[in-house]
Amino acid sequence: MVGVQICQGMTSEILFFSLQPQFSNMMNKNSRLHIDSNIRNTFFTEIGIGVSANSLLLLFNIFKFIHGQRSRLTDLPIGLLSLINLLMLLIMACIATDIFISCRRWDDIICKSLLYLYRTFRGLSLSTTCLLSVLQAIILSPRSSCLAKYKHKPPHHIFCAMLFLSVLYMFISSHLLLSIIATPNLTTNDFIHVSQSCSILPMSYLMQSMFSTLLAIRNVFLISLIVLSTWYMVALLCRHRKQTRHLQDTSLSRKASPEQRATRSILMLRSLFVLMSIFDSIVSCSRTMYLNDPTSYSIQLLVVHIYATVSPFVFMITEKHIVNYLKSMYVRVLNV
C-alpha cells in the first residue's frame, strides 16, 4: 500500500503534473475531451455533488459551533476537511472549464494561482485524512494508554498542526510558481500541457529528483501513520468486543456508542481513500503505457475526486443530529 501511494505521488499527485517527456503532447490528444459531452457532464455532475455535500457538512459544523454544542476532538478536522475539499473542488471546476470548454485564454497569474492552490489543497486533504485517523485512535485509547493525555487537548493545538501542514505544503509546492506558465503560441514539444491555457516548464533532473523525494518522504510518513492508527483502532475494537460479548443480548450492547460510530466512519473513509488511491495509480500507469490515452485521462479526472465527493456523505450518515435534521426536512418537503 505504501508503494502504491508513493507511485501515486510521483505520477498523479497534482493530477496533471507529470514529469515524463512523453506527456508533452498531452493536449494534442486530450483536446478532444471538450467534444465529449458525456465525459464533461459526468465530471461537472461529480464536482457539483461534491461541492453541495461539503458545503452542507461545513454548515452543520458551523451551526454546531455557534450553538455551543459540546465538540469532539475530531470535529475541527472534519470541518477543516470539508472546507479543504470544497475549495479544492471549486478550483478544479475552474480548471476543468479550461480543459473541457473552449474559452478565453488565461494569463500567467491565473494559471499559477489556480494550479498552485489546487496542488496545496490536494496535499492538505491527504494530511487531514491522516490527522483524523490519528485523532480517532487517541479518542479510542484507554485511560492507561500513553495517548490518553492527548484526549483533552484544546482545539487550538489541532489548528496549529493544520497551520504547520499548510505552510509546509505551500513551501513544497513553491517551485510550481516558477514552472507554471500560460501556454505560449508556439509549436513546440518542450512544454508539458496542463490545460488549454496553462503549461508547465520541464524540470531539470535535480529538481525532478528533489520533488519526487519530498513526495515519497511525505507519503511514507502519512501512510505509516494511517497504517499504525488503523491497526491500533482495530485491536482496541476487537478487545472491546470480546469484553462485551456476554452483553450481546442486552439492548445496551446493540447500540453503538458515538465513538464507535465515528470510528466506523473513519475506517470507511480510509478504505475508500486507499481504494481510490490504488485505482488512481493503476490509471496513471495505464496513461504512461498508452501515451496519455484520452479515455484513461478522463477516467482519472473522475476517480481522483471521488474521495472529496463521497467523504462528506460518510460523515453525515454517522451523525445522528444531521440524519434527524435531514429526515425532518424531507418530511416537510413531502407535506408541502
From Swiss-Prot:
> Which cysteine pairs are joined by S-S bonds?
C111-C198
Annotated protein name in UniProt: Vomeronasal type-1 receptor 102
Q: Which UniProt keywords apply?
A: Cell membrane, Disulfide bond, G-protein coupled receptor, Glycoprotein, Membrane, Pheromone response, Receptor, Transducer, Transmembrane, Transmembrane helix
Name the InterPro entries for this protein: GPCR_Rhodpsn_7TM, Vmron_rcpt_1
Q: Which residues lie on this side of the membrane: Extracellular?
A: 1-42, 97-120, 179-213, 286-296
Give compartment(s).
Cell membrane
Q: What are the TM regions of this chain, as residue ranges?
A: 43-63, 76-96, 121-140, 158-178, 214-234, 265-285, 297-317
